[in-house]
Swiss-Prot record:
PTM section of the record: Phosphorylated at Ser-16 by PKA and probably PKD1K; required to protect cardiomyocytes from apoptosis.
Name by which UniProt lists this protein: Heat shock protein beta-6
Organism per entry: Bos taurus
Subcellular location: Cytoplasm; Nucleus; Secreted
Function: Small heat shock protein which functions as a molecular chaperone probably maintaining denatured proteins in a folding-competent state. Seems to have versatile functions in various biological processes. Plays a role in regulating muscle function such as smooth muscle vasorelaxation and cardiac myocyte contractility. May regulate myocardial angiogenesis implicating KDR. Overexpression mediates cardioprotection and angiogenesis after induced damage. Stabilizes monomeric YWHAZ thereby supporting YWHAZ chaperone-like activity.
Pfam entry (one): Crystallin
Leader sequence segment: none
Keywords linked to the UniProt accession: Chaperone, Cytoplasm, Nucleus, Phosphoprotein, Secreted, Stress response
Similarity comment: family membership: Belongs to the small heat shock protein (HSP20) family.
């Protein structure tokens, strides 16, 4: 008795199936032993259980920021809820605002965690670097604002000069 054996490469067998997981049942030698499962096949089995392993949770991601930098106006809203006020430093260096936050390793519900980040923002033209202010809300949002540079008074003509 002769048993037919498929000699197609596995990638061709998978590509030629009408729909993944719905290929016609084949013979014993047509099955993909030892090849593992494709990611799509795993997700079809239990998509909700696998999603946390492939997607980074927003609470673990880097802080998010909303930045508004128009000429003469500067505003940053930065989510720093994982840091205490003592762990956050805001300083002006030249025409940049630098934000640094860090906390040492400490226990949390999953083990131990340490966090640190650095952000640097260029001040737009027309903004006074000496007028940069920052405030931390109770929700953990750091607000950094900068006022426009004071307008220079127009030069006055010397007394006795004729106006044209």
């Amino acid at each position: 008795m002769e048993i037919p054996v498929s000699v197609q490469p596995s990638w061709l067998r998978r590509a030629s199936a009408p729909l993944p997981g719905l290929s016609a049942p084949g013979r014993l030698f047509d099955q993909r032993f030892g090849e593992g499962l494709l990611e799509a096949e795993l997700a079809a089995l239990c998509p909700a259980a696998l999603a946390p392993y492939y997607l980074r949770a927003p609470s673990v991601a880097l802080p998010t920021a909303q930045v508004s930098t128009d000429p003469g106006h500067f505003s940053v809203l930065l989510d720093v809820k994982h840091f205490s006020p003592e762990e956050i430093a805001v300083k002006v260096v030249g025409d940049h605002v630098e934000v640094h936050a860090r906390h040492e390793e400490r226990p949390d519900e999953h083990g131990y965690i340490a966090r640190e980040f650095h952000r640097r923002y260029r001040l737009p033209p027309g903004v006074d670097p000496a007028a940069v202010t920052s405030a931390l809300s109770p929700e953990g949002v750091l607000s950094i604002q900068a006022a426009p540079a004071p307008a220079q008074a127009p030069l006055q003509s010397p007394p006795g000069a004729a106006a044209k």
